[in-house]
């Protein structure tokens, strides 16, 4: 029996395998997510194989010459503890070598492991859950001078520019795929001139049992704007809804609590090198934990 690990670039035909792994781990992958990840950086996703058996996977997205992100680090249960995960890890880190900053999202149980590789904790990310009946939840405050519009009601260039000023690194290719994927619904806050003042997306996701929804990203100029966007995203979506909020935006917790969400888990954002310097006070929900 072949015992040599082969690490190959992720093929489209590999995606159903990863979806099943992620679903079983409780990651609640969104429909279409992994296709988007693969198309964001074709050189930055890999599968490990022993013969014809899939062993594990990892992604290392190189956004530019300043920033990269490691995610989707999974090893199938039967292959754990045999060094295959380390080989995948080394492949990802080699791909991002030379970058001044690399980020990842870690389970608490993995904090010490990543620290040994030079990563340091930055903040806590909280996963929130709402059991929605699909009704519209009116925000506590009114929002004058802005319209809540579907994604088709605002130019993508406006949304791209808004996102680029609030993320560690511009991500135009990823965001284009994210905004236009047919599985999701996008809403934005626009002023009378059509300028973007916030946006969010909700997409169907695969839970361990059944299906639910994931919101992300969620960005807005103000907490009031975030609340109105959240209300629009939740409306007409029944069932389990998840959103991941960044710990560095202390106002996000209150917005989500006011909207009926409850915390169900936490992860740790970690960086190797100089952490991003920009503020994320206007980021209330992360697009996904796999790509940062």
Question: PLM features: residue spans?
Answer:
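A short helix-loop-beta-strand connector motif used in the catalytic cores of GNAT acetyltransferases and
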Residues: 30, 35-56, 67-69, 101, ...
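Active-site/acyl-donor-binding loops of N-acyltransferases
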Residues: 106, 117-137, 203, 217-219, ...
